[in-house]
């Protein structure tokens, strides 16, 4: 269990850079982690780059402010909260309207399922929120909490509530839920994209939870080092 109030500024910066780089890279963004650091922490554009890719990364600066403020206020997940996350992360980075649920049906390339139709998105997400809250309330261990968060992430990506940006929103909700529960955040590295996508595509909850626990172990070590540094 972690103390959110005790996390160092350096750790928050590190988390922001890694979330921005890995989550956007999983979706195909070509900027390096060094490029991401330059944009977010150093405040300069290190080279010529695609404008959309730059906005995808820069949006994480606003998102980290949003995340910290929401944690401080104790904000619970809600439909409006999810739309706000999308609005922040997808500003100037998608063709659709950031912060608005999809209005036409969409498909996931290569998937063997059909996402929730637009007219059912709000209902399905409301049930998703209720189920997540119930599972977390019933959790008797940290592993139970992580299983609930992973289970609901798989389900969120199958609802696919937005026209674009579903993956980065879903992964941001993983981090927020972990921090809400005082658990080490889970940052999925782009190097493990195939493994991660396989867990989603096959709905392999057991494998996904084991993977998440591996990532938490790595995060725990990063937290320890940043605390020692501070």
Predicted regions, residues:
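FIC/Doc superfamily catalytic core
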Residues: 1-230
């Amino acid at each position: 269990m972690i103390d959110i109030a005790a996390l160092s500024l350096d750790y928050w910066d590190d988390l922001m850079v890694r979330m921005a780089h890995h989550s956007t890279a999983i979706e195909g963004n070509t900027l390096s982690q060094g490029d991401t650091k330059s944009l977010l922490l150093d405040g300069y554009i290190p080279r010529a780059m695609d404008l959309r890719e730059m906005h995808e990364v820069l949006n994480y600066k606003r998102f980290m402010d949003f995340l910290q403020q929401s944690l401080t206020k104790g904000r619970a997940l809600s439909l409006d909260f999810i739309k706000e996350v999308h609005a922040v992360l997808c500003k100037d980075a998608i063709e659709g309207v950031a912060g608005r649920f999809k209005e036409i049906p969409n498909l996931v390339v290569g998937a063997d399922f059909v996402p929730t139709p637009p007219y059912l998105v709000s209902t399905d997400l409301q049930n998703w929120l209720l189920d997540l809250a119930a599972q977390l309330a019933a959790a008797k261990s940290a592993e139970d909490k992580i299983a609930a968060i992973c289970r609901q992430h798989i389900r969120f990506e199958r609802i696919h509530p937005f026209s674009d940006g579903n993956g980065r929103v879903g992964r941001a909700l993983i981090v927020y839920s972990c921090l809400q529960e005082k658990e080490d955040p889970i940052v999925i590295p782009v190097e493990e994209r195939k493994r991660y996508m396989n867990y989603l595509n096959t709905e392999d909850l057991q494998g996904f939870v084991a993977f998440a626990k591996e990532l938490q172990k790595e995060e725990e070590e990063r937290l320890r080092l940043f605390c020692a540094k501070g």
